[in-house]
């Protein structure tokens, strides 16, 4: 049984992670944290999520519970995730990171910590999205050289970063399959007189509206035809279940940086 701590357990995603951990037969929620100023600190995590009494209470600092968990699952914000990453390094704990919006310097720090403890990091934890990443690699190898590639993503009005980590992950999969770095070919905004698109660029468009959980489409467009690969999520439990699956898988692994491709064994396809 893998003992899991949920960072930001009172948030929308945090509550789903608590539920997903509770229903997974190989996992148990044994700790959860919230911001120190939260009025929910001290509340029973199970009751908070409508799952009944767990006798596990929200803390304002996971270090207070460090002997009570094996793996942290963190879908919060970069500054909080990096603090929990350092905590895991100091105490030899594993961490599953679902937070997005890291700078290049912060990503480098995560890579450095992964030399000391097991880390899974992915822009999206749904099985379907990670299968899409593999499909995009294959499509890019066949069509990327002669098609225009555009990525469109849509999320709810409360999402604070754009484009989404999943959209960037799609772009990285396509660019990598074509021998490029995404940072060299990505175009994140178009406005006014932009001129014709270049051959290699990968364009991104972002929608923020209503309660959209997450929709992503990658388009390979040629003259006379186009191929679109789309994923639509309708329930955040999809992501939560995948993250808990990753936590259970990670617990038995040595220090290193892993992705959902590793968790799901997609490199074997």
From Swiss-Prot:
InterPro entries noted in UniProt: DapB_C, DapB_N, DapB_N_CS, DHDPR_bac, NAD(P)-bd_dom_sf
Protein name as catalogued: 4-hydroxy-tetrahydrodipicolinate reductase
Broad class of where this protein is predominantly found: cytoplasm
Enzyme Commission numbers on file: 1.17.1.8
Binding, NADP(+): 35
GO terms under cellular component: cytosol
Localisation: Cytoplasm
Keyword Amino-acid biosynthesis listed: yes
Binding annotation for NAD(+): 8-13, 34, 98-100, 122-125
Pathway involvement of the protein, from the record: Amino-acid biosynthesis; L-lysine biosynthesis via DAP pathway; (S)-tetrahydrodipicolinate from L-aspartate: step 4/4
Family matches, as SUPFAM superfamilies: Glyceraldehyde-3-phosphate dehydrogenase-like, C-terminal domain, NAD(P)-binding Rossmann-fold domains
Biological processes, Gene Ontology terms: diaminopimelate biosynthetic process; lysine biosynthetic process via diaminopimelate
Superkingdom classification of source: Bacteria
Catalytic center residues: 155 (proton donor/acceptor), 159 (proton donor)
Reaction equations catalysed: (S)-2,3,4,5-tetrahydrodipicolinate + NAD(+) + H2O = (2S,4S)-4-hydroxy-2,3,4,5-tetrahydrodipicolinate + NADH + H(+); (S)-2,3,4,5-tetrahydrodipicolinate + NADP(+) + H2O = (2S,4S)-4-hydroxy-2,3,4,5-tetrahydrodipicolinate + NADPH + H(+)
Primary enzyme class: oxidoreductase
Keyword Ion transport: no
Residues annotated to bind (S)-2,3,4,5-tetrahydrodipicolinate: 156, 165-166
Record key words, sorted: Amino-acid biosynthesis, Cytoplasm, Diaminopimelate biosynthesis, Lysine biosynthesis, NAD, NADP, Oxidoreductase
PROSITE patterns in alphabetical order: DAPB (PS01298)
Pfam families: DapB_C (PF05173), DapB_N (PF01113)
UniProt organism field: Vibrio parahaemolyticus serotype O3:K6 (strain RIMD 2210633)
GO molecular function annotations of the record: 4-hydroxy-tetrahydrodipicolinate reductase; NAD binding; NADP binding; oxidoreductase activity, acting on CH or CH2 groups, NAD or NADP as acceptor
Function of the molecule: Catalyzes the conversion of 4-hydroxy-tetrahydrodipicolinate (HTPA) to tetrahydrodipicolinate.
Family of this protein: Belongs to the DapB family.
């Amino acid at each position: 049984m893998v003992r899991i701590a949920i960072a930001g357990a009172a948030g929308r995603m945090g509550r789903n992670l608590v539920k997903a951990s509770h229903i997974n037969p190989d996992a148990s929620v044994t700790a959860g944290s919230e911001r120190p100023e939260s009025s929910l600190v001290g509340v029973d995590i199970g009751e908070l999520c409508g799952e009944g009494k767990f006798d596990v209470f929200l803390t304002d600092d996971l270090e207070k519970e460090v002997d009570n968990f094996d793996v942290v699952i963190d879908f919060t914000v970069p500054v909080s995730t990096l603090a929990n990453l350092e905590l895991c390094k100091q105490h030899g704990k594993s961490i599953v990171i679902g937070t997005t919006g890291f700078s290049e310097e912060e990503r480098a720090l995560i890579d450095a910590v992964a030399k000391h403890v097991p880390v899974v990091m992915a822009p999206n934890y749904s099985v379907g999205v990670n299968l899409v990443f593999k499909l995009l690699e294959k499509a890019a190898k066949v069509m990327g050289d002669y098609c225009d590639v555009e990525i469109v993503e849509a999320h709810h009005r409360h999402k604070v970063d754009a484009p989404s980590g999943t959209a960037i992950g799609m772009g990285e999969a396509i660019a990598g399959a074509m021998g490029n770095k995404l940072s060299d070919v990505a175009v994140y905004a178009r406005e006014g007189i932009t001129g014709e698109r270049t051959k290699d660029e990968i364009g991104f468009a972002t929608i923020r509206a209503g309660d959209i959980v997450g929709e992503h489409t990658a388009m390979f467009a040629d003259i006379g035809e186009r191929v679109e690969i789309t994923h639509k999520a309708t329930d955040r439990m999809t992501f939560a279940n995948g993250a808990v699956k990753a936590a259970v898988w990670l617990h038995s692994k040595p220090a290193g940086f892993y992705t959902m491709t590793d968790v799901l064994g997609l490199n074997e396809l």
